[in-house]
Amino acid sequence: MSIIGRNDDSLARARSAIEVNVAAFVDRGLTSEDEAATLLDRITTGTDYNAAGKEDFVIEAVPAQRDLQIEVFGRLDTICDADIVVASTSGQPISLMVNRISYPERAVAMHFVYPAQLMPLVEVCGGPQTLPEVVTWACDFLTSIGRTPALMNKDVDGFIVNRLQFAVLREAWSMRANGIASAEAIDNSFKMTLGRLYSDTGPIESAELGGLDILHTFAEFLFPAIDDSKTPPEALTELVRAGNHDLKSGKGIYGWAERDGQA
């Protein structure tokens, strides 16, 4: 397997991250040291795009910036054979990224969910021009490496996982902004109930286990009260503008330096 990066520094960081994750698997008894060494030996790195022309399958993993992804696909188009499969790891529709390639029928989205080394599911979505056999190949390939493909029927923004996740995030931020509950109460409520429930049954399965008649009755009552905003919440916008982004910046809703959980 070849990893092609923009520069040596980014490749060094990528290699280091892979080694750390593989070492964690060894430490937990999920693989042996010999298997880990064999895996790492199979990975080569470089900055020469032409190396992609030697592969049967190329997948982009650049930041989710559409212009950059389109540029990468355009460069690959000048290098790769017409029968190669090209894929995007983005949760954005593949149809929005193929305007600079001459074989859009060979392009497919394969969205690995972060952290990819732990999450077994990969969303697979072809565009309007993608050949059915390319989508089938992508699913078969993922199955062969121990992943579970989630095949989508339509090329839509966000795919399955992000659409579900952002529905939850929108309501969570709305409840905090409206003073319904603290961030800690909201997070604990999810972790200690839905987080555990949905690890065994999905939302549609859970609804059928509880009864669709009950779901329908409660939906009539609750749906009108749930947030349906079309823009990010103001509280989130203010945090981003202030530079209080996340764990890396040390502060968001939570003060990560002390992690007191009071919000």
Question: PLM features: what roles do these ranges have?
Answer:
Residues 1-24, 28:
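NAD(P)+-binding Rossmann beta1-loop-alpha1 motif at the extreme N-terminus of oxidoreductases
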Residues 1, 43-45, 107, 149:
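Generic structural signal for residues in well-ordered beta-strands
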Residues 133, 143, 147-150, 178, ...:
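NAD(P)-dependent Rossmann-like dehydrogenase/reductase catalytic/cofactor-binding core
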Residues 9, 24-85, 92-95:
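Rossmann-like NAD(P)-binding element
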Residues 86-154, 158-162:
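Rossmann-fold dinucleotide-binding core
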Residues 2, 144, 161, 165-171, ...:
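Structural/interface elements that position substrates and couple domains in central-metabolism enzymes
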Residues 21, 120-121, 168-172, 203, ...:
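A general alpha-helix detector
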